[in-house]
Structures are given as structure tokens and as C-alpha cells.
């Protein structure tokens, strides 16, 4: 612990020794009683005893002798209770001394992790279980050597199963025969009796049902041979006590060194044993501590008894477990005192073992303890794991005070950093601050004054009655702190933003329309939550970082996220339309004010093309002086933009005006207007580009310019969408009559396919594919026709077309369905599906030929509604799957924080264009991939030798274009995949932050941002295997979300979609049919050293031809590559590039752009572990899995020192399910999945968690080690005050 700040800096977990438990305990619990049913006070020595756990009431003992704080620390002579606060009942523990040793269930059970006792003793876990549960005996000592050894040390004597029972009996009889043959009967009477006993045992053991206790036989054999047999946890305890860990470690290590193959089962088990023994050796945990001699009784307030109405009580399940343990323990003590026969004794011990097992882990027992309602009781393990467990319910997420929620409505009158909060909500949320102002005795300058009310009660009354005196105070109080707004589901960081509250009437929260995209909110009944930041630091952080007006660009792609939508787009589109021959065309205005006046007098139309001198815009740059030819609307729009910004006239070239837009003085500008090419209006895309320009030019100069300009654009958008009076009507739908000719053709084709199929010339799969493909192309053709149709001049003023063209609402697909045809509908593909078929039939092959305007027939309506409903269920399924994936991504990357400026690595990732090798289409161009990265070496022009991009300097958009234009197709750049930083990554390897276009700041939690950027668009990915351009490829390869899951979880593709890959570099020497099987092709790949034959099913699509060159990992057949196979064949670099390419393919096919570097962050976490093959002179052991940077560091030391051999290792790749549990933190891992396994391993290891990630620190209530968590509080508050002054 860090004493200065009382901040916990690391935590260790381990096995508790019996002495340690007694040291923690405040007393032994010996009675199973809880509370007295009459007085309701805790019973003495019971599970709630005040003497052990502390007083029930603050500073009051049980008998009432001492009351009040003045006796603090005193212990009552009468009842033994310490006088202190009652909160200690949440901290103090007791213990139960067990009458017999008990094995801990986490250490004996095989699942979810290999049984630790089994690994240490090298006895199978089933045998351990049989010994612990008193089924079988185990040999503890082989004897004195006078007799031949019939039983080996640690051998389990199985008497339960028929087969092994027979073997055991014959071994026992053999031993007994040796004994009675060695006895000299003549020597004494005693010998004769012993001989007789041995004979009797010998004869009786021939039968399967024995009339005596087997223990008598063991005791008899023991007295002669010195052999000892044990049963129960006591026997295991003795074995664990006597084990020599150092000797075991050396033996296993030698065996591992000699073993050839590290992947066979025997070697894997040896590695697991070595690991367990090394953990115990290094952690100072003793193996015998895995067997319990006493158990902790948890604090009573964590397992309360609660009184319900009607005098009934309800209690935590944990109490039932403890009661059972205490009852059985006390009974066992009595049985031992009374010297009961061993069969009764063992039975009692077994019952106690089961009771303790149930307390620790009830669910994993074969027959769990059930409650009254026949459900299994919740044991300590269940209290930890899952969504309702301690980690996720209580430690990582808590419910928050000072919060409210309500429905949201649009607030077009708000500024971008404002939110309208209903009065009733403000009165509740800001109540303590309002009361403080009401009872305050000093004014803001510090002078004394009379308070408005004298006490809190009166203040509350004023608030309740909404007295007039409180309004000035409320207005003052709400200015002091912003509020946080959150909309669930919070898929990325923009799901929570800060706003300055404004009082509004009604009960709904008013939300600024521009932030709806970031929240993914709409106004159809969505609700949002409001939270109030309390501390000065939280207020300052909300203002400096979370305030809505700073979030201009989205983190996933660096594109504007506050682009105007819907009405605002429509208004701006209408405003910037250009039409010839409108009222007022050709008028010349002296300045903007004159133009506005004439427009308000309705002498000129908003679409009219007019002239205005360039001198009317003194601060703007023009290519030349003269008369600017533009429209009234565009002048109005440019008037709200910053004065220095260039004049926006042509949406195709916003950055600069062309000479044609300006007519020199003295020339006839009116004739020019009549001949002028009419520019298009500003669409949503144009507005997005304007935001980009604004952000690029002004975000450094002054923070408030961009948001205030956006507010003005929003205002004129709403104003002119109202003025445009755009409406929607059935008569606006374009008329289209061409489709019948396509239908006739395609119907003939479909009939033809049917005939071919009936004659056996086509398979059903081929027929289906061709039919679906034919109808898809008809729909595409109809779609193209309608697209041409609505571009005709007569449709340019059509309301629906305006909405679609502007990007406000609707697209070409809606038009196709409205006036063309609905086309093909999807169906669920396991409906009537033969499993053998390679084609997923997820489309109804009869299309809907009618359009909505014509109306659908009954069968069409049915198919249509079937498809629509499937869409709805898919969306619901997708949302939950995508949410789970985001959680896994966050867990895998939560400790990736930018911790350093430069790790000085000399290795990088080679970037080249990502293209679909099959179709040759570019998925992501090299320009896009290069922007915002640092090259490792100078990028030099191949011809002129000019340095285009110096090493270590950022590549801008212009430089990236230069590099590509120079014909360079590969550039090695810095990448997080090769960052040498041990904790987190460095600034240079990541490059620039997409939201600021500057170098990423130190302490940014880039891992979480990466996870959110990939997870957030996950819901937009399709669930169905969609077909690009009809049905392109014959096979159905998982696409969309399923493909993403395959890549990140490292799931091998299914047999039919798996691609066969080459293992060597060489040439395809031949492709022939197999002589044994005509359905199989044999592809032979040859090089100078070897040749390999690959068997390929006849119906697979080949990717190679004879004579093609292949590399290791090249595809031989079409499909998805198994990543683990690729890793073996081609190495980690190829695998990393393959995953980046495939993930980008999934997203970009859906039109979603994500920066490469986020995918790299995820891949870094999945591929940053290696497994030791040979330890050399290092401290690693063979088979150990370690972090790649640790491995590199250790090897660098070994290479620099003389005569030392470095270790060798192979790269591993883990899926998202495993990656979080491989991080250094057991707390983060345990709070993710497999809680039991991770905590068990950590205990045996004695693992130390140094709290480097975010989750671990949240659990301990520390500030997280990123962002402002690394700054001082004074700095944060100062920044907050600066920001407050900036608000416009």
C-alpha cells in the first residue's frame, strides 16, 4: 500500500495456512444457532455472536452494561463484546475448527481447471476424489522390505468397481499368504492365533462380499509388513506433507528436456505438473495448505438474516451451509470421543467433507444442496461469478446516486453544450446544492450575511413548495456544474457526454439535435439518464473532456460525428439549390445586408442566381476581384460560417473557388448567368465535408468556433426546411412501367433451369443459385432504371426525390420498392434445409414482382411479412451478440494504455494495399492506411531519390498521396504490433489520435477506445451470409458478424468453408484427378527439396493453376483459412496481416470504415504470448507461456552475457475468450470469465497483481491509471475553469 495517498498499489492472493486463519479470526463459532427467536438478539458462540463479530448497535454491548462512545475500545466483562461501531460486523471474521482435515473442493475438482492436488501428487483426479470421499484407500508407506512389494507407494486400492476389486483382493490374498507362510505356528500360541487370523482373512477375501471391515485386514498387514494405508483427506494431507517439491521439479524437468514433441498429451500433462510445482515452490505456499484444518466464517453482515412482515425471516444461503457444517462437525467430535467403529467414523467425515464442499462450491457437486423451493443454494463460488456475482454486480458497476432518467424530446433552440432538464428533476438532483445556498451565512465575497432560512428542514419546505425565493438560487447553482447524459446501450465513449443544464418546463429532457448521431438516439420514446458530477475534479473533467461541443469527430474513423441529419440536411439542401429563371435572377447587391433585406421583401427568390461583389466579404480570399456569381441561399449560408473561411459555392470543390465563379468588373455578368452551369445543392456529404474543413482550420485557433458554427448551420437548416414546405404524398412516387419485359425473360430462364434440373443436368443447389442470381439481376436492373428516371429534370423538384438526393431520408432501394418491385425476400436458412447442401438457402426464390404503390398479392404479402419478421428477430439476436463481443474486446484490451513517448523499436509493420485477391477490388487503399502513421525508415522517391517522408515524422494525407503517386507499393511503419513498451504502448507506435488529428496523448486508454470502435458498428453487420452481386461464389463462406467472430475468437472454419493452404514455397507442378477416388483432385506443389500432394474435393473452387508460384500459407482452394494452421505454416507476421485484411473486408463490405490501428491493438493482445520450447540458461521452464516482451528482455540479457544460451519459443495465438485470462492481472481475468479457475491458479501461484490495468483499479476504488487519473487534481480544476470561460 502507498502510505502517502492510502492508495492500494498491489495485491497478493495465496493459500491460507491454518495458523493464518486463526490469526485472522476473532473467535471460534461452535454453535449452529443464529439469533434468538424471542429477543431477536444473536446467540452466544453462534453464527452471529456479538463477542466474535462486534456489536449490533454502535457503541453498545450485548448485555447493555456499556452504552455511548466514551467507552470505545472497552471489552464488556459480562458479555465479552468490544464497544465499537457496528460496521465492524462487515469486516470481522470467525472460524470453525474442523474435527477432521477436509480437502478444498477447488483443489480437488478437475473442472474447470486441472485438479491441483492431482497434479502435485501425480495421481489421477478420479482416484483423489475416491480417496477424499472415503470410497477407496491409498498406500502411504510401502513397508519395511521384509516382504515382497505387492502394492506401490501412492497406489489407490480400488474396492468399488468389480474388475479392479478382484485384482485388489488377489493382491491382498498374496500378501496374506506370504504372511501366514512366514509365521512359525509351533513357536507360540500367539503365532498360532495370528496364523489363524491370516488364514481366515485369506479365505474370506476369495468371496466378493466380505463379512468384516477391510480396515481390519489393512491393520493386520500393517503390523507385519510396516505398510500403511490411508483414506480420506487425512491420507492426502500426509502425502502432501511429505512431498519434496525440489526433487519433483528436477525429475519432471529432465523428462521434459528429453521429450521430442511438446504437443502430445503426456508432455502437456508434464508441463501442467511442472507449472503447478514451480508455482508452489516460488510462492512459499505449502502443498498441505490445500487441505483445510479450519475454515473462515465470513462477517455476519455479508450474510444477513432479514425480518419480513408477518414475523417471517429470510436468510442468506451461506448461513444454511455454515449451520450444516457446524452440526456435522460437532457430531463428528462426539463420534471420535466415543471411539465409534471406523465405518461410522468415515461416514461422518464424508458428510463433513460434503458440507464444506457445498459451502465453497455447491453448483459443481453432483447432488447440490437444495433450498425449500428445490433450487440449488448459492454458495461462495456462485457469489463471485457471473453477471450477478460480486465482481460484476458490486465491484465493477454500482448504481449511482444523484441520477435521474426521463424521455427525450428535441431541443432545437439549445446551444451545442446545453441540455434542457425539467424543473422537477433539477430540484431533486441539485437539492443539496440549493439547500447549501439557502442556509449559507456568507456571500460569495466571504462577508457574513443572514441566511435565507435557518435550517435544512425549512429549506426542504421551500423547495417542496417551489417558493419564488429559490429560482435565483437554482439559476446560480446549475451554472456551477454540468450534468452527464447517458443513453443505453453505451456502445462507445460518446454514449456519455456532458452538457450545461438549462431549466425547461414539462417532464422531458430536451436534447440538442446534433448529438443524436453520437448517442444513436431518436425521439420515438427513447429515454436517457442524467448524472451529476459532485467533486470539483469531476466537474472540471466533465467540462474539459466530456463536454459535448468538443466531440466533433468520431473515434472509430476520424470522420465528423456531429453532421446535421434529416430536417437540417433538407433545409440546407433547399437553401443551396440553384435554378435558372427564378424571380430576381441577375440582381446585383452591394453587400449581404442589402441582399437579406431584398429577400425578406420577397423581391428575390432563395434559389435565384445573383451577383455580389467580392469586396462584400472583406476577410475572405478570392482568386480575383470582381462580381461573385452565386445564389441568395448560398450567401445566407456563407454568412453564418467564420469570416475568414473561403466562400462555399461548388459542392464538388469546396476548398477553393474557381475563376468561373467570378466575373471581372465591366463584363456582362447577366449573360454569364444565363449560360452558367447550374451547381448541385449541398447534400449531407457536403455538410460533413464542411465540418471537416471547420475542424481542420479552427480547432486549434479557438475551441468554440466549430460548435457555434454548427449551431448556426443547424438553425438555418430547421428554418429553411420549414420554409421549403417539403411534404410527402403517394402521387410523388415516380411512375415506372418497364419491368414487365425483364419478368418475361427471367420467367423463361427459370423454367429452363427447372427442366435442366428435372433432366438431371443441374443439381438442386446449382438450380437454386442460378434462379436467385437471375432474379437478383432483375432487381438490380429495375433499380438502375429507376435511378436514371429520378435524375430526369422533371423529378428534381419532387419532394421524395429531394429528400433522397439530399441524404435527409431514404435511398434508391426505397424507390425500387415503392415504384419498381420489392424483389427477393430472405427466409431462415435452416427452414427445410438439407444438411449436406453446401449452399445456404436463405432467400425465398420466388420474388415479389409488385411494388408497394401497385399493392401486393396475398402470397406476396405473406412472403414479405415473413422476411420482415426475420429481419426483426435477426436484429434482436445481433444486438446481444454484438454487445457480448464488445465486452470481450474491452476485456482483452483494457490494460493497453499509452504510457511512453517512444519505445525506440526498429521493427515495424509493412503496409500495402488491401485488396480482394479473387476479384481484385481494393478494400482499403495504401493512402488510407498510411495517413497518421510514422515510417520506420526514410521513404525515398524511387527515381528522383527525394525523401518523401523522413523516418519518425508523421505521414499526412498529402505525403501519403505523394508516396502512392511515386509508385511505392510497400512502406514499413511503426505499429503497436511491434511496440517494445512492456506495460501498454508508446505514442510513436500508435500514431495520431483520430479525434484530434494530433499525436495521441500520453495515458490515453487506447485499448478501450479500440475495442469500442470495433464493437460499436458490430450491430450494423449482417447476420445473413449476404451475396455480393447476386450469388457470386458457389460456396457460402461466413460473412458479416459470424466471420468477425471466427476471426477474433480464433474459431476454425467449418469443413465446407475451410481453405486448403500450402505448407511450403514452390510451384504448382500438377493438378490431376486422384486414381483412387474420382471425386478428389490431387494438387502437387514442388520445390528443390520436397514435394507435397494436397487432396482437394472435386466441387471445391481452386485458387491455383499449374505453374503458379505459391508461398507458405497461400490458398490452394477458395474459403477461409484456419488461423492456427496458418501460424504453424507461415509465422506470426502473416497471421497478423491476414486478420487485419479479413476484419477490414467484413466492415468495408458494409460501408463501415475503421482505422487499421484499432484492429492492430486487438491483434497485439491476441498474439503477444509465446511458449518456451527450450529454456537455455533462462529461468523459464519448457512449456511455460509468457509475454513476448518479457521473453525478449530476458533473451537480450542472456545474449549480452558470456557463455549463456538464450531461450527459444514459439508464437501462440489466443481467441478473445482466452486472451483476457492471459493478462498479468488475476483480478481483471477473474472478473471476466472462469472465475474459479483463475482464482485457484492465482492462489497456488501466490500471484501478485500490480494493478496496471483499468478494471483492477476500479475494483479497488482507485483512480484508473489513464487520462486525468495520472494528473494532479489542481491541474484538472484549473483546466476546467479555463474551459468554462470559453463557452459561447
Swiss-Prot record:
NCBIfam families linked to this entry: rpoC_TIGR
Self-association and partners: The RNAP catalytic core consists of 2 alpha, 1 beta, 1 beta' and 1 omega subunit. When a sigma factor is associated with the core the holoenzyme is formed, which can initiate transcription.
UniProt-listed HAMAP family: RNApol_bact_RpoC
SMART domains per UniProt: RPOLA_N
Similarity comment: family membership: Belongs to the RNA polymerase beta' chain family.
Gene behind the chain: rpoC
Annotated GO CC locations: DNA-directed RNA polymerase complex
Binding site for Zn(2+) 1: 61, 63, 76, 79
Function as written in the Swiss-Prot or TrEMBL entry: DNA-dependent RNA polymerase catalyzes the transcription of DNA into RNA using the four ribonucleoside triphosphates as substrates.
Cofactor binding, note field: Binds 1 Mg(2+) ion per subunit.
Binding residue positions for Mg(2+): 522, 524, 526
GO aspect biological process, one term: DNA-templated transcription
Record carries keyword Protease: no
Reaction(s) catalysed by this chain's protein: RNA(n) + a ribonucleoside 5'-triphosphate = RNA(n+1) + diphosphate
PANTHER family hit by this protein: DNA-DIRECTED RNA POLYMERASE (PTHR19376), DNA-DIRECTED RNA POLYMERASE SUBUNIT BETA (PTHR19376:SF54)
E.C. number(s) listed in UniProt: 2.7.7.6
Binding site for Zn(2+) 2: 903, 979, 986, 989
Pfam family, one: RNA_pol_Rpb1_3
Cofactor requirement: Mg(2+); Zn(2+)
Keyword line: DNA-directed RNA polymerase, Magnesium, Metal-binding, Nucleotidyltransferase, Transcription, Transferase, Zinc
Domain of life according to the entry: Bacteria
Molecular-function GO term, any one: zinc ion binding
Name of the protein this chain belongs to: DNA-directed RNA polymerase subunit beta'
Amino acid at each position: 500500500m502507498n502510505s502517502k495517498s492510502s492508495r492500494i498499489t498491489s495485491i497478493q492472493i495465496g493459500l491460507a495456512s491454518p495458523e493464518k486463519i486463526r490469526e485472522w479470526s476473532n473467535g471460534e463459532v461452535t454453535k449452529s444457532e443464529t439469533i434468538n427467536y424471542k429477543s431477536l438478539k444473536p446467540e452466544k458462540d453462534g453464527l452471529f455472536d456479538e463477542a466474535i463479530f462486534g456489536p449490533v448497535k454502535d457503541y453498545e454491548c450485548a448485555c447493555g452494561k456499556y452504552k455511548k462512545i466514551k467507552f470505545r475500545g472497552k471489552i464488556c466483562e459480562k458479555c465479552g463484546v468490544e464497544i465499537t461501531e457496528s460496521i465492524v460486523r462487515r469486516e470481522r471474521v470467525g472460524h470453525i475448527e474442523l474435527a477432521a482435515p477436509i480437502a478444498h473442493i477447488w483443489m480437488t475438482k478437475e473442472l474447470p481447471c486441472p485438479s491441483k492436488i492431482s497434479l502435485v501428487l501425480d495421481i489421477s483426479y478420479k482416484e483423489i476424489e475416491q480417496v477424499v470421499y472415503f470410497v477407496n484407500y491409498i498406500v502411504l508407506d510401502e513397508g519395511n522390505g521384509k516382504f515382497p512389494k505387492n502394492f506401490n507407494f501412492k497406489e489407490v486400492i480400488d474396492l468399488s468397481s468389480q474388475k479392479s476389486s478382484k485384482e485388489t483382493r488377489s493382491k491382498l490374498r498374496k500378501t496374506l499368504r506370504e504372511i501366514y507362510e512366514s509365521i512359525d505356528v509351533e513357536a507360540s500360541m500367539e503365532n498360532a492365533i495370528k496364523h489363524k487370523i491370516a488364514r481366515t482373512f485369506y479365505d474370506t477375501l476369495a468371496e466378493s462380499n466380505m463379512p468384516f471391515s477391510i480396515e481390519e485386514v489393512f491393520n493386520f498387514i500393517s503390523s507385519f509388513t510396516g505398510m500403511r494405508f490411508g483414506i480420506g483427506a487425512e491420507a492426502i494431507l500426509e502425502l502432501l506433507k511429505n512431498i519434496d517439491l525440489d526433487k519433483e521439479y528436477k525429475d519432471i524437468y529432465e523428462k521434459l528436456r528429453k521429450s521430442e514433441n511438446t504437443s502430445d498429451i503426456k508432455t502437456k500433462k508434464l508441463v501442467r505438473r511442472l507449472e503447478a510445482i514451480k508455482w508452489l515452490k516460488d510462492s512459499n505456499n505449502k502443498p498441505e495448505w490445500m487441505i483445510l484444518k479450519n475454515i473462515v466464517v465470513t462477517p455476519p453482515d455479508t450474510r444477513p438474516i432479514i425480518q419480513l412482515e408477518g414475523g417471517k425471516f429470510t436468510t442468506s444461503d451461506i448461513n444454511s451451509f455454515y449451520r450444516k457444517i457446524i452440526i456435522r462437525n460437532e457430531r463428528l467430535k462426539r463420534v471420535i470421543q466415543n471411539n465409534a467403529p471406523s465405518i461410522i467414523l468415515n461416514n461422518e467425515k464424508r458428510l463433513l467433507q460434503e458440507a464444506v464442499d457445498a459451502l465453497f462450491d455447491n453448483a459443481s457437486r453432483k447432488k447440490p444442496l437444495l433450498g425449500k423451493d428445490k433450487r440449488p443454494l448459492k454458495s461462495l463460488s456462485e457469489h463471485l461469478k457471473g453477471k450477478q456475482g460480486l465482481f460484476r454486480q458490486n465491484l465493477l458497476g454500482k448504481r449511482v446516486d444523484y441520477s435521474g432518467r426521463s424521455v427525450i424530446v428535441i431541443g432545437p433552440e439549445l446551444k451545442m453544450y446545453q441540455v434542457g432538464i425539467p424543473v422537477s428533476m433539477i430540484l431533486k438532483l441539485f437539492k443539496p446544492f440549493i439547500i447549501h445556498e439557502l442556509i449559507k451565512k456568507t456571500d460569495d465575497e466571504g462577508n457574513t450575511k443572514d441566511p435565507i432560512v435557518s435550517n435544512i428542514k425549512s429549506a426542504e419546505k421551500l423547495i417542496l413548495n417551489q417558493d419564488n425565493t429559490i429560482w435565483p438560487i437554482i439559476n446560480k447553482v446549475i451554472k456551477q456544474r454540468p450534468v452527464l447524459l447517458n443513453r443505453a446501450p453505451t456502445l462507445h465513449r460518446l454514449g456519455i457526454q456532458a452538457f450545461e443544464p438549462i431549466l425547461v418546463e414539462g417532464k422531458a429532457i430536451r436534447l440538442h439535435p446534433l448529438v443524436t448521431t453520437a448517442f444513436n438516439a431518436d425521439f420515438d420514446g427513447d429515454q436517457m439518464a442524467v448524472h451529476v458530477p459532485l467533486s470539483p475534479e469531476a466537474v472540471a473533467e466533465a467540462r474539459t473532456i466530456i463536454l459535448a461541443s468538443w466531440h466533433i469527430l468520431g473515434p472509430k474513423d476520424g470522420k465528423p460525428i456531429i453532421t446535421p441529419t434529416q430536417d437540417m440536411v433538407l433545409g440546407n439542401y433547399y437553401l443551396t439549390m440553384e435554378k435558372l429563371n427564378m424571380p430576381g435572377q441577375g440582381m446585383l447587391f452591394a453587400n449581404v445586408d442589402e441582399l437579406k433585406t431584398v429577400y425578406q421583401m420577397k423581391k428575390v427568390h432563395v434559389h435565384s442566381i445573383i451577383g455580389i461583389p467580392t469586396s462584400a466579404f472583406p476577410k475572405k480570399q478570392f482568386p480575383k476581384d470582381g462580381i461573385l456569381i452565386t445564389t441568395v441561399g448560398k450567401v445566407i449560408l456563407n454568412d453564418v460560417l467564420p469570416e475568414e473561411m473561403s466562400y462555399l459555392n461548388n459542392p464538388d470543390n469546396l476548398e477553393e473557388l474557381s475563376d468561373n465563379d467570378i466575373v471581372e468588373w465591366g463584363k456582362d455578368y447577366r449573360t454569364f448567368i444565363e449560360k452558367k452551369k447550374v451547381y448541385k445543392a449541398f447534400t449531407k456529404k457536403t455538410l460533413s465535408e464542411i465540418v471537416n474543413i471547420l475542424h481542420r482550420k479552427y480547432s486549434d485557433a479557438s475551441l468554440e468556433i466549430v460548435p457555434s458554427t454548427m449551431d448556426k448551420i443547424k438553425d438555418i437548416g430547421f428554418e429553411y426546411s420549414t420554409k421549403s414546405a417539403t411534404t410527402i404524398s403517394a402521387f410523388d412516387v415516380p411512375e415506372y412501367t418497364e419491368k414487365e419485359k425483364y419478368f418475361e425473360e427471367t420467367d423463361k430462364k427459370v423454367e429452363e433451369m427447372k427442366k435442366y434440373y428435372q433432366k438431371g443436368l443441374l443439381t438442386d443447389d446449382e438450380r437454386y443459385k442460378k434462379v436467385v442470381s437471375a432474379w437478383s439481376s432483375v432487381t438490380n436492373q429495375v433499380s438502375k432504371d429507376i435511378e436514371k428516371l429520378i435524375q430526369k429534370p422533371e423529378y428534381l423538384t419532387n419532394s421524395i426525390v429531394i429528400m433522397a438526393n439530399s441524404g435527409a431520408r431514404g435511398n434508391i432501394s426505397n424507390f425500387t420498392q415503392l415504384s419498381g418491385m420489392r424483389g427477393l425476400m430472405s427466409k431462415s436458412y435452416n427452414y427445410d434445409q438439407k444438411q449436406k447442401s453446401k449452399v445456404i438457402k436463405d432467400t425465398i426464390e420466388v420474388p415479389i414482382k409488385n411494388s408497394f404503390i401497385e399493392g401486393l398479392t396475398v402470397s406476396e404479402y405473406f412472403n414479405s411479412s415473413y422476411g420482415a419478421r426475420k429481419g426483426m428477430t435477426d436484429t434482436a439476436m445481433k444486438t446481444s451478440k454484438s454487445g457480448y463481443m464488445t465486452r470481450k474486446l474491452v476485456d482483452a484490451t483494457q490494460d493497453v494504455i499509452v504510457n511512453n513517448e517512444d519505445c525506440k523499436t526498429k521493427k515495424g509493420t509493412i503496409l500495402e494495399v488491401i485488396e480482394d485477391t479473387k476479384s481484385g477490388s481494393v478494400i482499403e487503399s495504401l493512402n488510407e492506411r498510411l495517413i497518421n502513421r510514422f515510417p520506420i525508415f526514410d521513404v525515398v522517391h524511387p527515381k528522383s531519390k527525394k525523401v518523401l517522408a523522413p523516418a519518425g515524422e508523421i505521414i499526412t494525407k498529402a505525403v501519403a498521396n505523394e508516396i502512392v503517386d511515386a509508385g511505392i507499393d510497400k512502406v514499413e511503419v511503426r505499429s503497436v504490433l511491434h511496440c517494445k513498451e512492456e506495460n501498454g504502448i508508446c505514442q510513436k507506435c500508435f500514431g495520431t489520435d483520430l479525434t484530434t488529428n494530433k499525436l495521441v496523448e500520453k495515458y490515453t486508454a487506447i485499448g478501450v477506445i479500440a475495442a469500442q470502435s470495433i464493437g460499436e458498428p458490430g450491430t450494423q453487420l449482417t447476420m445473413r451470409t449476404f451475396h455480393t452481386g447476386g450469388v457470386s461464389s458457389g460456396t457460402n463462406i461466413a460473412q458479416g458478424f459470424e466471420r468477425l467472430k471466427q476471426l477474433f475468437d480464433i474459431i476454425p472454419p467449418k469443413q465446407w468453408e475451410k481453405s486448403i493452404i500450402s505448407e511450403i514455397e514452390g510451384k504448382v507442378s500438377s493438378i490431376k484427378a486422384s486414381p483412387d477416388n474420382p471425386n478428389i483432385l490431387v494438387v502437387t506443389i514442388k520445390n528443390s527439396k520436397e514435394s507435397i500432394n494436397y487432396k482437394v474435393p472435386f466441387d471445391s473452387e481452386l485458387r491455383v493453376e499449374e505453374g503458379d508460384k505459391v508461398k507458405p500459407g497461400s490458398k490452394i482452394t477458395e474459403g477461409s483459412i484456419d488461423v492456427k494452421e496458418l501460424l504453424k505454416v507461415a509465422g506470426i507476421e502473416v497471421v497478423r496481416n491476414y486478420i487485419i485484411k479479413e476484419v477490414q473486408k467484413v466492415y468495408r463490405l458494409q460501408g463501415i470504415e475503421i482505422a487499421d490501428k484499432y484492429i492492430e491493438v486487438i491483434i497485439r493482445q491476441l498474439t503477444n504470448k509465446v511458449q518456451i520450447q527450450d529454456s537455455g540458461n533462462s529461468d523459464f521452464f519448457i512449456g511455460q507461456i509468457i509475454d513476448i516482451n518479457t521473453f525478449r528482455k530476458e533473451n537480450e540479457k542472456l545474449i549480452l552475457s558470456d557463455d549463456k544460451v538464450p531461450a527459444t519459443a514459439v508464437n501462440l495465438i489466443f481467441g478473445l475468450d482466452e486472451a483476457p485470462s492471459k493478462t498479468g492481472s488475476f483480478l481483471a481475468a477473474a472478473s471476466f470469465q472462469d472465475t474459479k479457475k483463475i482464482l485457484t491458479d492465482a492462489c497456488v501461484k501466490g500471484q501478485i497483481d500490480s494493478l496496471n490495468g483499468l478494471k483492477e483499479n476500479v475494483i479497488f476504488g482507485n483512480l484508473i491509471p489513464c487520462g486525468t487519473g495520472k494528473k494532479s487534481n489542481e491541474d484538472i480544476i484549473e483546466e476546467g475553469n479555463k474551459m468554462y470561460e470559453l463557452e459561447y
